[in-house]
């Protein structure tokens, strides 16, 4: 088990909250934080199937949920900034920023479900990594469910031949 100094992690998450409205600065700070906790000496089993084929940091499994918890209230309080930040994080070549983008979108208020739906459709129209797809469908769907648009969103995806 990896020891994580929760006091230091909370300070690092506070730095992320301070630059939440500046997506490029946030992305750099996030990469610095993830790089700080990366386990360089850990090697997964050779035959283990990776969760994602994107580049990824080898992080302790409790780190990303702690970051998500630390940013939850900020995401809920600043929905416009959350959308802008998620769009920037989704362009990142690493898996963890994309997973964080999906989580942040899931914290949007229900009145942003139309914007979320359009954003998800745009992202799903592109080739997508299975791990990132799983993160999208598990972490970002809450606003659609709250607005009772989840079923219609899925039916639209299934019936639209252009998105296949």
Enumerate the predicted regions with their spans.
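Alpha-helical scaffold domains
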Residues: 1-164
């Amino acid at each position: 088990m990896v020891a994580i100094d929760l006091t230091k992690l909370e300070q690092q998450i506070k730095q992320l909250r301070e630059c939440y409205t500046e997506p490029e600065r946030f992305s750099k700070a996030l990469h610095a934080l993830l790089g700080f906790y990366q386990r360089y000496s850990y090697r997964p089993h050779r035959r283990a199937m990776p969760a994602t084929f994107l580049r990824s940091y080898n992080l302790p499994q409790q780190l990303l949920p702690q970051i998500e918890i630390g940013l939850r209230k900020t995401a809920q309080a600043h929905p416009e900034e959350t959308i802008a930040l998620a769009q920037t994080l989704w362009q990142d070549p690493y898996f963890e920023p994309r997973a964080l983008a999906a989580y942040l979108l899931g914290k949007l208020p229900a009145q942003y479900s139309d914007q979320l739906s359009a954003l998800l459709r745009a992202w799903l129209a592109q080739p997508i990594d299975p791990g990132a797809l799983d993160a999208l469908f598990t972490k970002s769907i809450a606003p659609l469910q709250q607005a009772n648009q989840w079923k219609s969103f899925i039916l639209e995806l299934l019936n639209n031949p252009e998105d296949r």
